[in-house]
């Protein structure tokens, strides 16, 4: 199981977390152990130290590890799944075999407040009461684009499941993927990010 810890730095991916998860995914793949990823990730840790340390390069290692893994891969989005960090945490777009989400999921480029500030900045600035307009735009953005079934409608998740059914859904999914076979490309080895 690969999971974010929302009680530590809100669950963001930093250099160390990306490295640790990449090694773990590669280890599971090497020994043919299926991978279940539990997502609650608001993004990569911002900051000059992270940028100078190579957060993009280290995040790419995690992306590479997931993309090369041939074992069964199941993802479950618990709450937040924002931006590039969501993509590298075994999203449907990089080849997760099955992706589920709880009704509390939020899949987006960023949170509703930040997105509304960027998308509707002109309307907010032109409003008589900018704070009221911002609150209204955030509410509309959440209602239209961040409801739990929006991701399923767009094919980002296979199903929205009841949290009480999670254990059985994962058991059934692992049983279904037990005989997964992946055709490998005809190459000696990959070229991972350094």
PLM feature spans:
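Ligand-binding clefts of soluble mixed alpha/beta catalytic domains
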Residues: 2-194
């Amino acid at each position: 199981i690969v999971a974010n810890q929302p009680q530590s730095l809100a669950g963001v991916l930093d250099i160390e977390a990306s490295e640790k998860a990449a090694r773990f995914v590669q280890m599971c793949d090497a020994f043919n152990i299926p991978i279940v990823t539990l997502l609650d990730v608001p993004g990569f840790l911002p900051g000059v130290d992270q940028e100078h340390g190579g957060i993009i390069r280290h995040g790419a290692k995690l992306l590479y590890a997931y993309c090369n893994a041939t074992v069964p891969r199941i993802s479950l989005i618990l709450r937040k799944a924002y931006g590039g960090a969501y993509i590298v945490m075994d999203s449907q777009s990089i080849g997760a075999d099955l992706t589920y989400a709880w009704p509390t999921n939020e899949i987006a480029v960023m949170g509703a407040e930040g997105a509304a500030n960027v998308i509707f900045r002109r309307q907010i600035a032109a409003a008589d009461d900018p704070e009221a307009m911002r609150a209204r735009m955030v509410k509309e953005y959440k209602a239209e684009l961040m409801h739990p079934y929006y991701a399923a409608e767009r094919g980002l998740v296979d199903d929205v499941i009841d949290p009480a059914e999670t254990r059985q859904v994962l058991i059934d999914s692992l049983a279904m993927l037990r005989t997964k076979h992946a055709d490998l490309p005809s190459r000696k080895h990959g070229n991972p990010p350094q």
